[in-house]
Design a protein with these regions (language model features):
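Active-site neighborhoods and metal-handling regions in enzymes and metal-associated proteins
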Residues: 1-384
Length: 384
C-alpha cells in the first residue's frame, strides 16, 4: 500500500510527545516538507512551490493541528489528520501567521516553550520575517530547538519504513547490475543516465530526484554534478550515484564502470576502496559508533603513499531524505542502534583530480548489519 496505516503516524506523534514532556516543550511547530510528511503522511511535491507555508502543531497532548493554505485542504483530508484549519493563499501580507498565532495562544495562553526546527540538518519553511513576527507577538513564549528530538525518532526506522527502503534499494540494485548490457563506448553521460532512469521507472521506482554522474580517464574530480554530453572513451572511469524514491523513501548508492583499457593503478585503487568498505562492515553493529566505522575505513585509506580519501565524511543516514543524520566521520560519536539505515561511502583520491567512490546501503540489525544493496563487484566492471 502507499503510505502507512494511521497507527504508524499516531505512534510517531505519541513518541514525539513523550520526548516533548521530557524536554518541557509544550508544543512543536513543524514547517518542513519531510517532517510534515513524517507526522501526517501527506504525499505531495507541491512543496516545490515556495509561495505557501504549511504548519503542523503537535501539542504535548492531544492530536495535531494543521494550519495550511486552502488549496491543500482536500489533499490533507485524505490523511489521518482531522483538525485542519485553512487560510486563502497566496496572501503575502499575512501568509497564515495570524491563524498560527491564534492557535498557539489557545494552546499556550500564558507562557511556555515552543519547539521549532532550528538545529542541524533542519530548517524552517516560512519566511524569517514571518517567524520574527511570530516571536514578537508571542513574547511570553520561548522558541527553542526541537530538531534533536525529531531526529531521534526519524533515525530509527519502523518495520514498515524498512520494507519501503529495502524495495527501492532492490530496484536500483537490479538496474545497476544490468546497466552494462545497455551501454557502450561512445555514448554520452546523459544518454547512459537516461537509460538508467528509464529502467528505474520500468522496474517500479517513483522518482529519481538525485542523479550525479562524472567520468574521466582513470577517475573523476567531483561526484555531485549532473551528467553532461561528454562521450565515454577508452580508459574512462564512470560513476553514477542515484537518489531514487519509492513512496517517499530514498535509496542512495553508486556504481563505477570502466570503459575499454583500464590501467592497473585504477584497478588497484578501486580494490583498495572495496577493501575499505569491507573493514567498515566489520564495525557496523549496535553499540559501536559512526566514528568506529570511519576509523575502520581510515585504517585502509590513511596509509603512507596514499592520497586523500575523503570528501568530508564517508557515509550518512538515509530515509525520507537523501541524506540524514548521523554522519560517518571521525568526529561523530553517534552510537549505532538497531533499525538505523546508513550509507557506507568512502572516497579515495589516489592521484590529484582522480577519485573513486564506492557507496553501499546498510541496515543495522540486532546483532550486526544487513547489506541492502547488491554488493559492489570486487573487480571493476569493464564496458568494451
Amino acid at each position: 500500500m502507499r503510505g502507512f496505516e494511521a497507527k504508524e503516524y499516531q505512534d510517531r506523534v505519541l513518541k514525539l510527545q513523550k520526548k516533548m514532556q521530557d524536554k518541557n516543550i509544550d508544543i512543536t511547530l513543524i514547517t518542513s516538507p519531510h517532517n510534515f510528511r513524517y507526522f501526517t503522511g501527506l504525499d505531495s511535491y507541491f512543496w516545490e512551490s515556495p509561495t505557501r507555508p504549511w504548519f503542523l502543531l503537535i501539542p504535548q497532548s492531544n492530536d495535531p493541528i494543521a494550519i495550511i493554505p486552502s488549496i491543500g485542504e482536500t489533499a490533507l483530508q485524505k490523511t489521518w489528520i482531522k483538525n485542519i484549519q485553512t487560510w486563502p493563499s497566496p496572501q503575502p501580507e499575512d501568509e497564515g501567521v495570524s491563524a498560527l498565532m491564534e492557535s498557539l495562544k489557545n494552546i499556550i495562553p500564558h507562557t511556555g516553550n515552543i519547539g521549532c526546527e532550528l538545529g542541524q540538518e533542519s530548517h524552517l519553511r516560512m519566511s524569517i520575517n514571518d517567524f520574527d513576527t511570530l516571536r514578537k507577538n508571542l513574547s511570553n513564549c520561548n522558541f527553542i530547538d526541537a530538531s534533536e528530538i525529531i531526529w531521534q525518532l526519524r533515525i530509527i526506522k519502523s518495520q514498515e519504513e524498512i520494507k519501503k527502503i529495502k524495495k527501492i534499494i532492490s530496484i536500483a540494485s537490479d538496474v545497476f547490475d544490468n546497466l552494462p548490457n545497455y551501454i557502450k563506448i561512445g555514448m554520452t553521460e546523459i544518454e547512459i543516465c537516461n537509460i538508467f532512469k528509464k529502467e528505474l521507472l520500468n522496474k517500479g521506482a517513483d522518482h529519481t530526484l538525485y542523479m550525479s554522474c562524472a567520468s574521466g580517464v582513470g577517475g573523476y574530480n567531483q561526484i555531485i554534478c549532473d551528467p553532461t554530453e561528454k562521450k565515454l572513451q577508452d580508459g574512462d572511469l564512470l560513476i553514477i550515484d542515484t537518489g531514487t524514491t519509492l513512496d517517499g523513501y530514498f535509496c542512495d548508492f553508486d556504481r563505477n564502470y570502466g570503459f575499454g583499457n583500464i590501467k592497473k593503478e585504477v584497478n588497484d585503487a578501486y580494490l583498495i576502496l572495496w577493501e575499505a568498505t569491507e573493514k567498515a562492515f566489520e564495525k557496523t553493529k549496535p553499540g559501536l559508533t559512526c566514528a568506529d566505522i570511519s576509523n575502520a575505513m581510515g585504517s585502509i585509506l590513511n596509509k603512507p603513499n596514499l592520497a586523500s580519501n575523503s570528501v568530508g565524511r564517508m557515509g550518512h543516514g538515509l530515509g525520507l531524505q537523501l541524506t540524514e543524520p548521523p554522519s560517518i566521520m571521525n568526529s561523530d560519536k553517534t552510537i549505532l542502534k538497531e533499525n538505523m539505515i546508513i550509507t557506507i561511502e568512502p572516497c579515495y583520491e589516489y592521484l590529484p583530480g582522480k577519485m573513486i567512490v564506492i557507496e553501499e546501503n546498510i541496515l543495522i540489525t540486532k546483532d550486526g548489519y544487513e547489506l541492502l544493496t547488491s554488493r559492489t563487484p570486487k573487480l571493476l566492471p569493464i564496458i568494451n
